[in-house]
């Protein structure tokens, strides 16, 4: 795993000296992604910069890498897990190789399959390939969005980078996207492909693109996460799931450097660890928790590790450590991300890096196998399907006048509201009606439903559970789960691999019918059945906490003064009604409401603003800033 920057010049440059210096400065911003070495390639059409974290073919796997008399050049972030099989296939067709790296195999795959190359890959990746003969730049991002890829157009040049902070070096200004900010306040992340900078976008997962001289960037989707449930015997599906996970974990452990695994108290990471231990008996595991009672899975993780006969290394985080590291962590995010669980992920990655270079983790299991409690909702709302639409409207009016917290109010609201109007994913922080009080430039014509309506349209033939999974895969998973997984581990120069988010595993998971996702009130039912006899009994049906954080308690106690000062000193008055935010904090401390997630969401934006706009709380790594800030 690594990081890269690049530029495509629509008109060839007469000289490249200035561009070479710019690429070096951009590359310097992501040293944490690849501390082992750097590399560069330039011609009149493209400039490539690369930072390497050595994983496969440590001696000869450097980049940028060329193939076939320097006709093709590549910069690549990620891992291709089927590179051995692809190499054998290409060798049978007459291709030869000079290294043992997956990078060279990827380049040869493009040489042979051209724009069909991305669909041949099994892995996590973002890459750029320059074809010198045809003057074509080709790039792609992996199917689920495990690896990031940002881009921006400045005059006649298109810039790319593994992290948005590199693009800030090339830009002369930041234009804060107020629509993206408004959506952030509901989702707790900026929904892709947007970023909080109006000039910068993300290449979407499962898509590829080409650029030709004097032409625009052209995108094409090569993978869609489509669900296709089938009715078949439970035992058959259990075996297919188990076999797919064993196969995925096996190929995800291909590495020339030490591999470990994160371990919480739930089924996801425990399943990964239990299987990985069979391939690598000396596997090290890593866990994190807090002193606050009920907010640590360290003891459960240690019990799991002991049952498997492997080592567990844990870290307990104090509120002081959390506060001290938060500005640096927000800088690593690139865009504000208000998931409190991102911070313990940063700390467990920091601890793991002392022992290994690669770590496995359980991201994606909830979205693929039906693990969130909210996925049980469609079953509980079945009786409402028989109620005529006119009566549902009347019941919604009744619910509207019921006091907040009154028993039955929420049930009526959910049961009488279509799924596409009430569900936007796993997090809904600020409702539209409340955002009017928060944001000074609230746009009443913009709704969080604008983000999800495309995904509901694409999944219109699905069951409600599959619709929810589809929405989560396209919003929550890529915007929150995978963003924090990449940014928090790469901040510590640690490669994270997620075996559940594998094309082979998804192909099996997509066939699971609803009744085998949630059964008898149990989430991820089929995954748990597949784990029987493999995962220690004490964790098999245990509810997952993940990386829980005692934010609700801290905002009233250890963090209260610190948070209050940030709100009062923040220079976000152009965007935020700060008096309203302070009132949220007062009500929270007085136990009038649990406003912890709302306060945290605004707080993270304020810290982001202080780093990117106000130039305060700047980590040492932040050596380049844009020259001008534009508020729109």
UniProtKB/Swiss-Prot annotation:
L-glutamine binds at residues 52-56, 77-79, 102. Keywords: Amino-acid biosynthesis, Asparagine biosynthesis, ATP-binding, Glutamine amidotransferase, Ligase, Nucleotide-binding. Pathway: Amino-acid biosynthesis; L-asparagine biosynthesis; L-asparagine from L-aspartate (L-Gln route): step 1/1. The record marks 363 as: Important for beta-aspartyl-AMP intermediate formation. PROSITE patterns: GATASE_TYPE_2 (PS51278). This is Asparagine synthetase [glutamine-hydrolyzing] 1. One of its GO terms (biological process) is L-asparagine biosynthetic process. It holds the Pfam family GATase_7. ATP binds at residues 288, 361-362. It comes from Bacillus subtilis (strain 168). Belongs to the asparagine synthetase family. Disulfide bonds: none annotated. InterPro entries: Asn_synth_AEB, Asn_synthase, ASN_synthetase/amidase, AsnB_N, GATase_2_dom, Ntn_hydrolases_N, Rossmann-like_a/b/a_fold. Residues 2-214 form the Glutamine amidotransferase type-2 domain. One of its GO terms (molecular function) is ATP binding.
